[in-house]
Design a protein with these regions (language model features):
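Intracellular alpha-helical coupling/juxtamembrane segments of multi-pass membrane proteins
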Residues: 250-304
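ABC ATP-binding cassette signature C-motif
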Residues: 1-259, 308, 317-513
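Post-kinase regulatory C-tail/linker adjacent to protein kinase catalytic domains
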Residues: 312-314
Length: 513
């Protein structure tokens, strides 16, 4: 029996259709991976099933008494709350039960109280608390907080002082502590390092309840799911098995469809040729009419148009001086130092990956090297003739510009055709190009930002988690382009599969701090 069912769902933004009469079901204990290219509608689907977005048509039906938890990276956290306060809200129901027990004991002291009835309710509530390990909640909170790296910045920290990545980890920890019947996870690994991803993988493998997962981290996704829903061309298709099994079946179905299409096209050509040659002759007119009827009744096989794939190409600028950045006794941070004094040298033509736990200062280091924020102590010497291209991890939301407007405003010397061609090279369609940036998926927004980088000549690329939100094809194309880039690269990245094998150096930030 389904615990979540979506029936005849259709939805779009303006004239851009996202879903067309699709259905979906989630059975108890299923581990579903929701997969598809950037912009196909995966996050939109999550927003619809959680009620954050109302579909144009169709129904979303939840079973009675089913609890669901959604990793909402935009949830509002109250000022004055500590990390522990937020994590303890995962057990609000149990704290209410404890408060009810205290009220019942107060009622027992009143004249005429029905002691037996009150004690029976106390017993039921007490059993519920003990079955949920209520009296060891803080130990459970500490266990999950430690496993996801939340302990790195402490559970007594005010949540409003957290970065976007730290905040997301707190929300993920709270969600896992709630242990709902259905987990809805949209890119949960984006802000996790390798150690924490491994823990989350083991947790989800052993999760006895159901979940729906969106992730472009394919090895992680493959290891935790047993059902795939593929989002493509406004449709949702269900496959049994893990991601790699889905790929095999999908490739086979696609190959079979293409072969059937070729056979049918040949048959159509032969029939049309026969009709054209024989319809005018009395002796063969009936045969020609018979062939024409066969053509008219034929169910035509249609191949879906290929989705545009990005083709990244970063232009090098003139050669800079030998040294790009030289940090001397550099201490970074905002109110207090995040590191010991750092002495780092980044030279011309080097490609360096910065790795390490989230929230310990990798982004702050990049911004300090670039001069965006001042150091607490020490200095940064920047080389001569630098042409810097910077890709930020987090950007402000609510951008009402279209990609066409954003790129054209940045490069007014280009004509409209040139701007459209530049965006198309990044894998964006006409509908993407003419939609507001704020309604695009995370991956599509990243492609707009890459387009801005590609149209400038840079001799240094500084990239902060550039693979976040990118689908598999875009990620592979980005890797190829960066490997071939003739300038210097300084990149923060949490995906070993992306940076290993072509970087000159790996700076482990855990060791620098």
């Amino acid at each position: 029996m389904s615990i979540l069912e979506v029936k005849n769902l259709s939805h779009g933004f303006g004239d851009r259709a996202i879903f067309e009469d699709v259905s979906f079901r989630l059975l108890k204990g299923e581990h579903i991976g929701l997969v598809g290219a950037n912009g196909e509608g995966k996050s939109t689907f999550m927003s619809i099933v959680t009620g954050k977005m109302v579909p144009d048509e169709g129904k979303v039906e939840w079973s009675k008494y089913v609890t669901a938890g959604y990793l909402d990276q935009h949830a509002v956290l109250k000022e004055g709350q500590t990390v522990r306060d937020v994590l303890r809200t995962a057990f609000d129901e149990l704290f209410k039960a404890e408060a009810r027990i205290n009220d019942l004991y107060m009622e027992m002291a009143e004249d005429g109280a029905d002691i037996n009835a009150l004690m029976e309710e106390v017993g039921e509530l007490q059993d519920r608390l003990e079955s949920r390990d209520f009296y060891t909640l803080d130990a459970k909170i500490d266990e999950v907080a430690r496993a996801l790296g939340v302990m790195d910045y402490g559970t007594d920290t005010d949540v409003t002082a957290l970065s976007g990545g730290q905040r997301t980890k707190v929300l993920l920890a709270k969600l896992l502590l709630e242990k709902p019947d259905i987990l809805l996870l949209d890119e949960p690994t984006n802000y996790l390092d390798a150690e924490h991803i491994d823990w989350l993988k083991r947790y989800l493998q052993n999760y006895e309840n159901a979940f729906v997962l969106i992730s472009h981290d394919i090895p992680f996704l493959n290891d935790v799911i047993n059902i795939v829903y593929h989002v493509e061309n406004q449709q949702l298709t269900r496959y049994s098995g893990d991601y790699y099994q889905f790929q095999e079946v999908y490739a086979m179905k696609k190959s079979q469809l293409e072969a059937a299409y070729e056979r049918q096209q040949k048959e159509i050509a032969d029939l049309k040729d026969f009709v054209a040659r024989n319809k005018a002759r009395v002796a063969t007119r009936n045969m020609a009419m018979s062939r024409q009827k066969k053509l008219d009744k034929m169910d035509i096989i249609e191949l879906q148009s290929e989705k545009p794939k990005p083709s990244f190409d970063f232009k090098p600028a003139r050669t800079p001086g030998r040294f790009i950045f030289q940090a001397k006794d550099l201490q970074i941070g905002y109110d207090c130092p995040l590191t010991k004094p750092l002495n780092l040298t980044f030279e011309r033509n080097q490609k360096v990956a910065i790795i390490g736990a989230n929230g310990i200062g990798k982004t702050t280091l990049l911004k300090s090297l670039l001069g965006i924020i001042p150091p607490i102590a020490g200095e940064v010497e920047r080389g001569d003739y630098l042409e810097l291209g910077y890709f930020e991890q987090e950007v402000e939301g609510g951008n009402r510009q279209t990609p066409l407007e954003a790129v054209w405003n940045a490069f007014p010397a280009l004509n409209q055709a040139e701007v459209r061609a530049a965006l198309a090279r990044c894998g964006l369609t006409t509908k993407h190009i003419e939609s507001q940036i704020q309604v695009l998926s995370g991956g599509e927004q990243a492609k707009v930002r890459f387009c801005l980088l590609m149209n400038r000549e840079n001799n240094v690329l500084v990239l902060d988690e550039p693979t976040n939100h990118l689908d598999v094809d875009a990620k592979e194309e980005l890797k190829r382009a960066l490997k071939e880039y003739k300038g210097s690269i300084l990149m923060v990245c949490h995906e070993p599969d992306f940076y290993e094998g072509w970087m000159d150096q790996i700076w482990d930030f855990n060791k620098l701090t």
